[in-house]
From Swiss-Prot:
Gene coding for it: ythQ
Topology term for the membrane: Multi-pass membrane protein
Lineage: Bacteria, Bacillati, Bacillota, Bacilli, Bacillales
Gene Ontology cellular-component terms listed: plasma membrane
Signal sequence interval, chain numbering: none
Transmembrane segments: 24-44, 67-87, 106-128, 133-155, 176-193, 197-214, 304-324, 365-385
Pfam name, any one: EcsB
InterPro entries for the chain: EcsB_ABC
Protein name: Putative transporter YthQ
Amino acid sequence: MNGRTLFFRRLFDYYKYQFKVLHAVIDWTVALYIVLPAIAFVIYQYIDLMNGRGLLYEWSEVAEWRWLYAVCVLIMFTGSIRTFLMEADKVFLLQKKEIIYQLKRYALLYSFLATLAKWLLLFFIVLPLISHSVLITFAESTALLCYLFGLHIFFLSLKQDRIRKPRSISRWIGDTLVRAILFAGSAILIVFTERHLLALFGILFLFFSVIRSLKKTASFTAFEAEVTEEKKSRLALAGLVMMMSQEAGMPKVKDRMRRKPLLYRNSKRIFKRRTICTGYKELFFKVMLRNGEYARQMYMLLSAFTVLIFVSPIWLKVIALLVYTGVCRYILTLIFDKVMDAPFLIGTDKESDEYYRARKSCINILHYAFAACCFLAAAVSLLFT
């Protein structure tokens, strides 16, 4: 067995597992009454948009090119450098290191091709829609595609560093500043730079990122972190499905490195008054602060609706705000119930007044906070309309 055979075997197993997850959720009734009508609706709206009519055409005329840049920014946050490593591979590192190295190189090539496929799909779907309104030529759009693809690969190479190194507040702030500078600089380059220079920047980003990624691939010092990240990538779709289910749950893929919480260390109390109600509330808030998955879910939901609000016309902003307030409260309810379903809380009385009072209070506090952020984004977006 060589690295190429091992790669294709694990790639097939990966997609087979994802297909089983989708098959478990989408049976023939769901496909017949929900999925197929949704696909037909999207195709119908796309044809109307191509012909210059329909609801989406009016929305795109108001939003102009801002919605496209928002979509590009969201794509930048997706993807990762795959390795297809497993915990059992550590046994072969001493004797068959070359096979693991070949596996990681093929996985790196697959990650680049998957990223390129995303941008090509967006390119061929969006180009016919904006060519008549933005007045962009095929050569200019190709240069833009080259730049965005190179920038995305550069972000993926930076994500490799975050996986290998322990997380900290200073590192998170630095990474956020780098992303903000690159996004702002990209907007300036896209608007004011000629297509040849824009394509050159994209090629430089791609060349630099490939060299960095190849060096990281040849190293085995972060084997445990890469295995953990691979588990998260494999379970991402299943976790998205299970997040909406109260009866089912996904096992959390934990990092082996022990980290101290940033807030309320050493079990420091949040509430001075100790009652059954405050005990439930303190448990829930500490889990929300220390469990990155729950915080990430709420952050992704808020980010998606914030972008939608910024690029939408006024009437669609109102609809987005109403939808977000309902979805946010529903997800917070699911999270609270999952937290309280922990094994050490089996003997607690979940039918008591204190439990329901704490449940309502916790959900209301976070719901009002997230809704306020969304309303603030809507107010700021009105300044640019």
